[in-house]
């Protein structure tokens, strides 16, 4: 059998883990039944209602946000302004 490849990806809210099985060196025997199942897990669609609250504090006369909040805002702006094909 082939190798088992395991990769991990992290974001600020969830931990993702995916495994890919590589059976490229395996050959079926004559008359052997083969069943291949594939699946894909989709992220839930964003909702219009907020799922978290944002807190801004005054720091030296200006508003301060965490790095996660800034990155989430940039990601939101990028996804809403991307041209659709």
From Swiss-Prot:
Q: What is the effect of changing residue 45 to L?
A: Reduced pathogenicity on N.benthamiana
Q: How is it modified after translation?
A: Phosphorylated by Arabidopsis thaliana ASK7/ASK-eta mainly on threonine and serine residues.
Q: Where is the lipid attached (N-myristoyl glycine)?
A: 2
Q: Which GO terms describe its cellular component?
A: host cell plasma membrane; membrane
What role is this protein assigned? Major determinant of pathogenesis that affects the hyperplastic response of the host to viral infection. Mediates the induction of cell division in permissive cells, mainly in phloem. May act as a suppressor of RNA-mediated gene silencing, also known as post-transcriptional gene silencing (PTGS), a mechanism of plant viral defense that limits the accumulation of viral RNAs.
Quaternary structure annotation from Swiss-Prot or TrEMBL: Interacts with Arabidopsis thaliana RCH2, ASK7/ASK-eta and ASK6/ASK-zeta.
Query: What name goes with this protein?
Result: Protein C4
Q: Which organism is it from?
A: Beet curly top virus (strain California/Logan) (BCTV)
